[in-house]
């Protein structure tokens, strides 16, 4: 994948700070160039549903018994290229929905893979509806200040399991927002590096009541499998580090309540960077805007909160 040049952007949120940050774009030379590339691409894409037969982690493939794809292919069992995270998440007999991609070289791949789980989907959907209502009721006061409680939500982690704040009750939580395709070294990549550094330093300092959460800014692309691949490629210890994704509406409401700006302008994702620390009672106790914060500073706050 080819990544982008930087474009400066002046952003002001409905929160008490003003920031200047670059935009992140998964493309090479602007909207016109990307549109032309898509027009010239010979890739074909189709929605797909089916049942996983088995995964091959070494070859990074899934064998799927898929349903008929109208106008393209009858129902059959086929092997598809996928991410290593998707293979790791795969369970034999699991129903999935995905996007089938016929690449220019003829290879067939699956992207945007989601498990079809009515129970989990209902749980996430219900929580997302409640979050939407809460954000709407709060109106102009939707932004949560330091001292307010963490909003309730439910999202999927990098393994596809449903995660809500209840899972972390009695623990401190450090939260930030990233997306896996972000090419700007001083933004998401630095934010992730700082989070993993904080995780390591917290462990060394004996802070054991801490969980780390990175919520995607790009839920359409960042499926559980993509997030798991992202974590694995960086050697991140996920025993207390969750990467979350879910409905776009829920992500937008969380961004609003946390005072984070993220908006696609064409293919460009313009966003700010913020990191928050939540105490064991669910209260926001610290916030750092931008990506130049110190892991040692957060660990110090954690140690103080633990005592």
Which residues fall in each region the model found?
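Bacterial signal peptide processing site
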Residues: 25-27
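Short aromatic-glycine-enriched beta-strand elements
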Residues: 58-67
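N-terminal "domain-start" segment that seeds a small globular fold
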Residues: 92, 115, 119-165, 193
